[in-house]
Amino acid sequence: MESSSPHHSHIVEVNVGKSDEERIIVASKVCGEAPCGFSDSKNASGDAHERSASMRKLCIAVVLCLVFMSVEVVGGIKANSLAILTDAAHLLSDVAAFAISLFSLWAAGWEATPRQTYGFFRIEILGALVSIQLIWLLTGILVYEAIIRIVTETSEVNGFLMFLVAAFGLVVNIIMAVLLGHDHGHSHGHGHGHGHDHHNHSHGVTVTTHHHHHDHEHGHSHGHGEDKHHAHGDVTEQLLDKSKTQVAAKEKRKRNINLQGAYLHVLGDSIQSVGVMIGGAIIWYNPEWKIVDLICTLAFSVIVLGTTINMIRNILEVLMESTPREIDATKLEKGLLEMEEVVAVHELHIWAITVGKVLLACHVNIRPEADADMVLNKVIDYIRREYNISHVTIQIER
């Protein structure tokens, strides 16, 4: 028996007897000292700096939202305006969305553990589910109160205070739009390519190959983010170099997705604040038109619920382990079958641990004369380049 142990890999070769009837070669790679999960704690200092900047901006956005939400709750009660309270409920949904984005960035630095081998990203989904239930409860209470007021017609609304609070909200939203929009508008300007392979974060390869006298061979590959390729020839190097720029660009867009989502939330809030201002101005002008406040309440309640639909859909799809909507599994399989060395693809599974953290596993049958290592890297390169799935497990079969 011969063994070789590089820093992050372990290779064992076993020869049975004096013949080559059976040979087992196992190569494995783990992230750090723990089972590999989705921890990005090994990322370069540039990535850590960018993540820190994004977290700082989202923290400021959360604080501003909480301050303004408190002002709206107090102002809504004093003005007796359900529209303002509904806007406060909408702000709560934004706070939840910002907090989830913030947690996502924070958890990116957590280490996976032997028990939590995928890390702690699923907490993000559970937190989002709880926050949505709270938002639906508050919105339901406000809609019920609006209907009661429409029926009884006993409430009085302070239009001036309603207008003032909404105007303050518009100012806060503009500040947040400038804060978040700066990064949104410049997210494309800081990409650098490096020619050193150890900078390419495409996770490793685990290959298990069995050679029997029945000429039956299996290969397993496991990839997820930090690839130090000790290449199997020039073809592998060319494949990885070819897609490096494209993958880097996609990763850059992915890192900015949280701030872009927050930016869109703020734009929606600004429109709603303008609506409340108009309603407040109408009631300020003519207090008898207080029904405008109730109309705004019902309309904004629909908006609040509408903003959570996409959220709840994503949550259910993750919990059901559905194939993410942005990935066409049929097209992906077809792309693999178009490779001349590939005969068949089966047991194809694509799912997500949380939104944006996608995994893929499948079995790939190849031609008897094909080079298993070359096909392995070719398949992984295709999946990373075309679908930006960095956590990949492939089993090669003949």
Curated annotation (Swiss-Prot):
Disruption phenotype: No visible phenotype under normal growth condition, but hypersensitivity to elevated levels of zinc. Its main location: membrane. The chain crosses the membrane at residues 57-77, 90-110, 123-143, 160-180, 264-284, 291-311. It is found in: Vacuole membrane. Residues 216-232 have a biased composition (Basic and acidic residues). Signal peptide: none annotated. Disulfide bonds: none annotated. Induction: By treatment with high concentrations of zinc. Residues 187-202 have a biased composition (Basic residues). It comes from the Eukaryota. Belongs to the cation diffusion facilitator (CDF) transporter (TC 2.A.4) family. SLC30A subfamily. This is Metal tolerance protein 1. It comes from Arabidopsis thaliana (Mouse-ear cress). The lineage of its organism: Eukaryota, Viridiplantae, Streptophyta, Embryophyta, Tracheophyta.
